[in-house]
Amino acid sequence: PRGPLRPLCRPINATLAAQNZACPVCITFTTSICAGYCPSMVRVLPAALPPVPZPVCTYRQLRFASIRLPGCPPGVNPMVSFPVALSCHCGPCRLSSSDCGPGRAQPLACNRSPRPGL
């Protein structure tokens, strides 16, 4: 038997962007995020029953890491923290730790030109 066309929920490497409006530089960095397919079910008789929440690929275990934005003026915190996925699972979407919207065609990117070499 063949598996799903999309890979199942798991940690993957992704390039994200970090910026602060008060700092002149945006930098990109690589971290691990949770991504992939989660099986779901659709009710055949949806009439009187509440909708079944669709599971999303989300963090099971994570840690936080930080990077420093260069060139921030005095008084502006140059540190940006981000989650690093250690393990993932299919579960309910928690807005506190997950982006529950549809997938993006493009990864998060800088609004201004990223600093080269970072």
From Swiss-Prot:
Signal sequence range: none
Family annotation (PROSITE patterns): GLYCO_HORMONE_BETA_1, GLYCO_HORMONE_BETA_2
Annotated keywords: Disulfide bond, Glycoprotein, Hormone, Secreted
Molecular function terms, GO-annotated: hormone activity
A GO CC term attached to the entry: extracellular space
Cellular localisation: Secreted
Listed SUPFAM superfamilies: Cystine-knot cytokines
InterPro entries recorded: Cystine-knot_cytokine (IPR029034), Glyco_hormone_CN (IPR006208), Gonadotropin_bsu (IPR001545), Gonadotropin_bsu_CS (IPR018245)
Matching Gene3D superfamilies: Cystine-knot cytokines (2.10.90.10)
Glycosylation sites: N13
Record-annotated disulphide pairs: C9-C57, C23-C72, C26-C110, C34-C88, C38-C90, C93-C100
One example of a Gene Ontology biological process annotation: G protein-coupled receptor signaling pathway
Listed SMART domains: GHB (SM00068)
Membership in a protein family: Belongs to the glycoprotein hormones subunit beta family.
Matches recorded under PANTHER family: GLYCOPROTEIN HORMONE BETA CHAIN, LUTROPIN SUBUNIT BETA
Protein role: Promotes spermatogenesis and ovulation by stimulating the testes and ovaries to synthesize steroids.
Subunit structure and binding partners: Heterodimer of a common alpha chain and a unique beta chain which confers biological specificity to thyrotropin, lutropin, follitropin and gonadotropin.
Name of protein: Lutropin subunit beta
Native species: Physeter macrocephalus (Sperm whale)
